Amino acid sequence: MPPKKGGDGIKPPPIIGRFGTSLKIGIVGLPNVGKSTFFNVLTNSQASAENFPFCTIDPNESRVPVPDERFDFLCQYHKPASKIPAFLNVVDIAGLVKGAHNGQGLGNAFLSHISACDGIFHLTRAFEDDDITHVEGSVDPVRDIEIIHEELQLKDEEMVGPIIDKLEKVAVRGGDKKLKPEYDIMCKVKSWVIDQKKPVRFYHDWNDKEIEVLNKHLFLTSKPMVYLVNLSEKDYIRKKNKWLIKIKEWVDKYDPGALVIPFSGALELRLQELSAEERQKYLEANMTQSALPKIIKAGFAALQLEYFFTAGPDEVRAWTIRKGTKAPQAAGKIHTDFEKGFIMAEVMKYEDFKEEGSENAVKAAGKYRQQGRNYIVEDGDIIFFKFNTPQQPKKK
């Protein structure tokens, strides 16, 4: 059953995965495709980036600020004492090889590292370099993408069987009626994952009860994926590479709606070694730009995260929430008392604030809104919360 299409294209997938905002996106790919170099330039860290299949054994984790012109504008406007942007948590995971689900390479350890992440930067290599060996002997990014997909799929298939066997023993043969709905849902998952051999996230009509069960098991193929294509510096600058069209065709066919972002690890490394002035000159001379801001934003969005702002002379801050969060729960991100004693959210749209020039001007234009507890916070809202302070119990 293909994903349903809405009026604006592909129907967005349901949110499957851990609930919360401290979510991680893992960099996944075959060995020697440029994962550690990408992680280094993304986080300005120095994880080992040797030409060796398993140079990253323990996943390196870092967090990177999410670039946002709105945040920058609010900081310039308020000139606050404290500036706190939103952050994306990124994990560099060692290279997967064919047969990983059976323990090949460092197999199951790597798959468990992926399981601990909430989304995937699927990095594939589309550059030739005789000095950097390819574990499969040749450069073919479409083949490499298929290998990773197959390993994740096979691991999920391997997981489903024991879960159903255990539930069948208790819910069917043991007569535990409470677990029967979970058993039925897992049978549906089995039909989709094993019989039809499709990733969990490709089914766009999981209901709330089914998602609750899926979230207990965190299947690898339920994780959202952003495809990153590592090009040579030359190909990235000239925006040409023989593999790009083939990769896009594959993704459109097998992972519709997923983003494909070309970048060049070599270019990003070069830019990092230049001074700010030299970097600007180099980018202008080659009529190009870094792909990192776009990649960071795409990873953040893939995790179904967004943020609202609190802004003033003391602090400008981006508060990370899940998409669909209501005002009281958003207030609770600041302090639990804000949620418990929630009265209302006073909301300005960033665009209105920038256009009108001040909070008072937004109010005068009738664009300052008072929202109740059913208001769903939108990305980029500037919010001031009103709340009652909980009464302290009287001492006896």
UniProtKB/Swiss-Prot annotation:
Segments forming domain TGS: 304-387
Cofactor(s) needed: Mg(2+)
InterPro entries, A to Z: ATPase_YchF/OLA1, Beta-grasp_dom_sf, G_OBG, GTP-bd, P-loop_NTPase, TGS, TGS-like, TGS-like_dom_sf
SUPFAM superfamilies associated with the record: P-loop containing nucleoside triphosphate hydrolases, TGS-like
Residues that hold ATP according to the record: N32, V33, G34, K35, S36, T37, L231
Keywords linked to the UniProt accession: Acetylation, ATP-binding, Cytoplasm, Hydrolase, Magnesium, Metal-binding, Nucleotide-binding, Nucleus
GO cellular component terms listed in the entry, alphabetical order: cytoplasm; nucleolus
Gene Ontology MF terms in the entry: ATP binding; ATP hydrolysis activity; GTP binding; metal ion binding; ribosomal large subunit binding
N-terminal signal peptide: none
Domain of life: Eukaryota
Motif interval(s): Nuclear export signal: 267-274
Binding site for Mg(2+): S36, T56
PROSITE patterns from the UniProt entry: G_OBG, TGS
Modification type N6-acetyllysine: residues: K294
Sequence ranges assigned to domain OBG-type G in this UniProt record: 23-283
Free-text function comment from the UniProt entry: Hydrolyzes ATP, and can also hydrolyze GTP with lower efficiency. Has lower affinity for GTP.
UniProt-listed PANTHER family: OBG GTPASE FAMILY, OBG-LIKE ATPASE 1
Protein name in UniProt: Obg-like ATPase 1
Annotated organism of origin: Bos taurus (Bovine)
Taxonomic path: Eukaryota, Metazoa, Chordata, Craniata, Vertebrata
